[in-house]
Curated annotation (Swiss-Prot):
Known function: DNA-dependent RNA polymerase catalyzes the transcription of DNA into RNA using the four ribonucleoside triphosphates as substrates.
Name recorded for this polypeptide: DNA-directed RNA polymerase subunit beta''
The organism's place on the tree of life at top rank: Eukaryota
Location of this chain's protein in the cell: Plastid, Chloroplast
Single GO biological process annotation from the record: DNA-templated transcription
Molecular-function GO terms, alphabetical: DNA binding; DNA-directed RNA polymerase activity; zinc ion binding
Complexes and interactors: In plastids the minimal PEP RNA polymerase catalytic core is composed of four subunits: alpha, beta, beta', and beta''. When a (nuclear-encoded) sigma factor is associated with the core the holoenzyme is formed, which can initiate transcription.
Binding site for Zn(2+): 220, 291, 298, 301
A Gene Ontology term for the protein's cellular component: mitochondrion
Key words, A-Z: Chloroplast, DNA-directed RNA polymerase, Metal-binding, Nucleotidyltransferase, Plastid, Transcription, Transferase, Zinc
CC cofactor note: Binds 1 Zn(2+) ion per subunit.
Disulfide bonds: none
Amino acid sequence: MAERANLFFHNKVIDGTAIKRIISRFIDHFGMAYTSHILDQVKTLGFHQATATSISLGIDDLLTIPSKGWLVQDAEQQSLILEKHHHYGNVHAIEKLRQSIEIWYATSEYLRQEMNPNFRMTEPFNPVHIMSFSGARGNASQVHQLVGMRGLMSDPQGQMIDLPIQSNLREGLSLTEYIISCYGARKGVVDTAVRTSDAGYLTRRLVEVVQHIVVRRTDCGTTRGISVSSRNGMIPERIFIQTLIGRVLADNIYMGLRCIATRNQDIGIGLVNRFITFRTQPISIRTPFTCRSTSWICRLCYGRSPTHGDLVELGEAVGIIAGQSIGEPGTQLTLRTFHTGGVFTGGTAEHVRAPSNGKIKFNKGLVHPTRTRHGHPAFLCSMDLYVTIESQDIIHNVTIPPKSFLLVQNDQYVESEQVIAEIRSGTYTLNFTERVRKHIYSDSEGEMHWSTDVYHASEFTYSNVHLLPKTSHLWILSGGSCRSSIVPFSLHKDQDQINVHSLSVERGYISNPSENNDKVKHKFFSSYLSSKSKKKSRILDYSDLNRIICTGFIYPTILHENSDLLAKRRKNRFIIPFQSIQEKELMSHSDILIEIPINGIFRRNSIFAYFDDPQYRRKSSGITKYVAIGVHSIVKKEDLVEYRGVKEFQPKYQMKVDRFFFIPEEVYILPESSSLMVRNNSIIGVDTQITLNTKSRVGGLIRIERKKKKMELKIFSGDIHFPRATDKISRYSGILIPPGTVKTNSKESKKVKNWIYVQRITPTKKKSFVLVRPVLIYERGDGINLERLFPPDLLQEKENLKLRIVNYILYGNGKPIQGISNTSIQLVRTCLVLNWNQDKKSSSIEEARVYFVEVSINGLIRDFLRIHLGKSRISYISRKRNDPSGLGLISDNGPDRTNINPFYSIYSKTRIPQSLKQNQGTISISTLLNRNMECQSLIILSSSNCFRMDPSNGVKSYNVIKESTKRDPIIPIRNLLGPLGTTLQIANFYSFYHLLTHNQISVIKYLKLDNLKLKQTSKVLKYYLMDENGRIVNHDPYSNNVLNPFKLNWYFLHHNYHHNYCEETFTIINLGQFICENVCMTKNGPRLKSGQVLIVHADSVILRLAKPYLATPGATVHGHYGEILYEGDTLVTFIYEKSRSGDITQGLPKVEQVLEVRSIDSISINLEKRVENWNECITRIVGIPWGFLIGAELTIVQSRISLVNKIQKVYRSQGVQIHNRHIEIIVRQITSKVLVSEDGMSNVFSPGELIGLLRAERAMRALEEAICYRTVFLGITRASLSTQSFISEASFQETARVLAKAALRGRIDWLKGLKENVVLGGMIPVGTGFKGLAHRSSQHKIIPFKIKKKNLFAGEMRDILFHHRELFDSCISKNFYNISEQSFIGFNDS
């Protein structure tokens, strides 16, 4: 009893790990037999207790953690703020994803940590709680899912799903959560089965590689070791102890002068504790890596056996044990299909918190600003940073380690427990990371702009791949785009030189919205096909069109510096290239000609433009026939038409007939002297020779007429009929017959499908006959009405101007039309006739002035057509065309006419179909320069895309203007607004042409060269301004609005004030500036929307809505500046590193990747570079032979340690403990081969041969010459196929190939491993009893040692060739163990 009183009593819970420790202590202390008795008693005790407790599990035992509600709420709040920041453009998509995952991961972890204390306090014997750490059933993670929250899931690829499951299994999941949990769960039968088979196959390959590794000797005599040190704190103590226990020291350990451990001593727990206490120098230990043998291992390099705690015995098959101990946990762990969501295996970063309230101070020189991986601004410390926090009575000092983020600013007031810094976690570098591409897609359609310079890699100059050099925003400016459904136009003048590429414009189909008005949502231009629809849809109220201003459909030629656009004005005719697709057939090219009289004055009813429809164009000659209803010329004087240099007078006939007929014929005009090869009234076929150098293009009847000095030869195609009686012929001469039945004689009648023309021909001698000729019918409705091109209210000035569309035939009824060779004949011309109302005001106006105005913006020259009623003086400003200011016209209109819109581009006023009412808005044309192809489209800026913000009285500028108005009341406030767009190249604003100038002067040059006072410049500059209604207002001469091109602000100047004073008026908002949402513009609070400033008003700002996307350096931007993107287009691609999920089911593929040495980024980036650099440096320093040796050695050592760490990391993250030596044995096998390289050919090995590293070293020593080789990592599969035994290889994979190769090479298998002997049914050469078996015969013991000495070199050579140290004796006799070990070692080391 006295003894029992002295015993300690421990009142502690013993879990699985504690029991393991106790057992190992028992074994150390009492030995195996005694321990097993104790454990039996513990087992019985356990069963008794379990029976007495009778634990059962009910649903009431699942108690939810009380703090869950507010933790989840807090996380949701953080996510909401994050979402806002992303919307404002402060954080990009990846930072948002990372941060949201970390928020939820942290929440889930807090809940998990709360779980155990909660159970301990409320119900310590809760069965769920007991199970959670018993180790037998489940673990804390599973219980956490039952009573905490299920948390983040990852999909089958191991990617995180950023929507967490907030419920736990006790509460039940919502439908969405259930689907996510199915998607991320690993409970699928197939999944488990597949993964189990994977793990099994991994085990098989591992065993295959190392099955022949057996402990054959006690000591290989190596002096090398691997040093392990816990001094720098890189290795946690637990792992340090695990690494050391059971190993053998490679060197003596000294403490000062005293030796505390000797070489070849094995390390127990006592020795490890002594090392930790004394903090000795790095400890050098022996590992399987350092063993000098090739195909076996010695006892000291292996260390203690895990089974009994002593040195491993000879004959132990340690290879197979190693393979199984790595593969088996995988097999077991695939069955643990729960998913912990532990993507961030490194955990969240540690935080440094302020100890008390106070002001923080640090040295600014030691930090530099950066962004954290969550997108927050922070300072990065490059070295240890000392931070002081001064509160009222005490000063705290905090040291922040290097590479940490400081989250506060200097002199900032911090509160107690506020996070002031974030320390990167130590395991950060060991994480499995992978580089991932993430594409960001556009949410809305619009136009792309960026706010920084962009790198164009030289090979990508014309492509749309751009790299961002610094963090910046990409903006998508809103606006629906619309392909013009009408033909694209150009107002290039006749004979202008144009870029070739500028004509390659996408052509849209012409649709008819009057039929399907509701369906055509995105066709912008309507085509009016009938005059009825024109009347119905007339716009009576001009205000409907207010916002639809388009600045001219011009092919935008982007003028490069070296190309001048030259114009030769000839006869004042302007050509609009026109091409349409009709019936999916490309018509031939045709132009719209706008003829403007040289004096620029149009009378009433004069033809303003005409268009030759290609449908009415014929290659052949012929006759037109129609029923004349009323034919009169439009303009009384006949116009001079210039036709291929031949001037002809052509009257223009207007016709009101529905159709006309064209009878084709072929006409040849030949000189009188030419010799004909055909006769008159003969019938010929196609391609008949008519004269020596002409052939007929059609077949038919020939008629020859001789005139003065020339012959006219006509070929009529058609059928010939010989009627019987002459009286019937008279009916059929020179008339058109409609489709129907034609009686040729009484007996037979012929059905005619088409119109025919019947002509009577009477030859002189022969019988007369009738020629029936085919007829081409032209319906009037066939052609393209110019109404489609010019909508009804096109050029109206208010309601005055009228356009009438007139078709007329160029040739009279029945007149023969003769074509000049190889040119086509235009039969019908469509004209646009200009007219205007004769109301009281304008009755006196008999003429309209028309002129072009050219506006040059960013080197693009835009032409506008202006039609002006009333008398006005026009003066030309002559400039060179290549001058960027362009050619301008000044109209001296007084201020009384400001309300009349001065600019009407021909194509700028267009009617929008009713269905597009909601899309009314300003139109801007953007130019896409896309791989040498320019394509033009429109953007409709509707009122929904514009946002107007009224700053209230808080704005400084507003007050200034008010004051100035009192002093100088002439300034009307309504004119203090400016549209966006200037003569400047401001970041290539291709799309904003709203500044319409009618006196274009190169402002930049003036301001730069002359430095004129702004007051003078303001007189030179005259702008048309566009107000918020889209109306264009003439410049008001009383207000001096000056656009300062340098700051791009609008300044309001008076004569009274000095320039500097006014500079302060509007410094807040610049035109064209991008404003993010939530930016404070006024004192009264934040703005509501993000966008680009379009118009600055005196008391308000008009923005074009835009969506910002943040992009960090290195991101790839797709698309060009100013390009139009549609919803869902790829905008940016980010490349970022993310840590891979660390659960074992995804860990197994990782282990496999490492062992198969597949190049995954995380390995190859480091190792390949290391190998290359080492090889280069070392050969330079040491010289070639030693260089290869040392380089290969170092590479291999470094790589081996790296591989072991990677594999251990996966298993440790799952709480699986595998001793390093198992992994080392396998890694040693896959890294012990080198590849003989081709430079420096050696006599022994052929290039490309795989040989063992040790064998190569021995060969170099023996031959005393360099063998060039490089290190190779074989994967476990390749290593299994390149062993010394072909039987083992053939039984693994590719049996036929392996056996065939072995036969050809005459390979010998010495049956050294287990597998070969199993295959052949022999005795397995392993096992602890094997040594006794080998020692049976002793007759060879007497081989004298000196014989060996004599024959040293031969033995060495054989050793090299067979590359087995124990090989050459075993072939003579089975018992090579009889040779004394000493002689063996002596021989090898000599």
